[in-house]
């Protein structure tokens, strides 16, 4: 019933499919409500939300966020630094006026909604289930129901999504800003504004500038960079001392974010650190590996963007964005497993293409990705004793990285190498006319 291709459902659908759809909606609603109760019914302590609130409170009180080794004493008993740019502390300030349970509930509920929104946007760009006679609901609503049905179990069973909620992280918020800006065919705002804001809130989304560069969309790339700069300057205007400290000192100190050897640090840097290599050879190997993965990503994304059939034109931008997202995760100095919330949209993409193309490769990627996130092998690495683990445990414990490599390679191999007949970004313009800042 839930057709995952662009073919129209048979006309004259009987009563049974309609009833099945209503049952599906009821089950999905029940699943989302159950997940909501799990997350909000008895609000657990979420340590990162605690730090966010204290960062916002420090800014409101005029206390330093970073200077003199500023540390925040969490209710969980750990002393942690504030690792985001000053603009993020300003954004978190309203939550400082709320109690910790209320702030936790607000951020958690927002995260759940945005996860459904992000998944809906991906399904829409992939043109999933565009026509049907089963229901009169518009396509976007059908896709939202499908997205909710995917998100509900993901929150409980997929390790990156589950841990994101357990810590109270904002990775889903950042991911949604990126997806909403990059994936739709058109946006009601000049494309690049949301990505620029995401970069100003946390530096890691800057990797998606590569996406617009690969699309040769220089106008949007420059608009994104300008937005990030303007937003960061707003941080200087509102928190001058903290901004100077962050951009001149703190931003270079990645050690304050956490120990690279921890098993949940799923990236190249973590894999090398766990081998026990010295700092100099490890840095050289990391740089070489990053350039190699960059070359692989550029190759795969460009092949995806050169597709010239109707299906590939629909899929190409999403495939390219997936490559860039995975590249950013594996080359970042720190990529905790809860940063890998991109696993959900990537799995949605591989599952849709596995069905649509009857692809063994995408089917294998989907199955492997689900297995790795549901039965995570990260725990094969003994926590805080990762460098003593055997080689096979180290390889298995870094499985997110190897899966990401496999996804990028498969996208490059299966994508058409034929040249697109039109401009790379002509179908992805925002609705805003040129006079108001048309995105190129």
UniProtKB/Swiss-Prot annotation:
GO function terms (MF aspect): hexosyltransferase activity
Enzyme class: transferase
Subcellular location: Cell membrane
A GO cellular-component term linked to this record: plasma membrane
Pathway: Phospholipid metabolism; phosphatidylinositol metabolism
GO-annotated biological processes: phosphatidylinositol metabolic process; phospholipid biosynthetic process
SS bond partners: none
UniProt cross-references to InterPro entries, sorted A to Z: GT87 (IPR018584)
EC number: 2.4.1.-
Residues annotated as transmembrane: 15-35, 87-107, 109-129, 144-161, 164-184, 193-213, 224-244, 281-301, 316-336, 360-380, 395-415
Membrane topology term: Multi-pass membrane protein
Domain of life: Bacteria
Chief location of this protein within or outside the cell: membrane
Keywords: Cell membrane, Glycosyltransferase, Lipid biosynthesis, Lipid metabolism, Membrane, Phospholipid biosynthesis, Phospholipid metabolism, Transferase, Transmembrane, Transmembrane helix, Virulence
Disordered: annotated segments: 419-440
Function summary: Responsible for the addition of alpha-(1-2) mannose branches to the linear mannan core on the biosynthetic pathway to mature Lipoarabinomannan (LAM).
Family: Belongs to the glycosyltransferase 87 family.
Name of the featured protein: Polyprenol-phosphate-mannose-dependent alpha-(1-2)-phosphatidylinositol mannoside mannosyltransferase
Organism: Mycolicibacterium smegmatis (strain ATCC 700084 / mc(2)155) (Mycobacterium smegmatis)
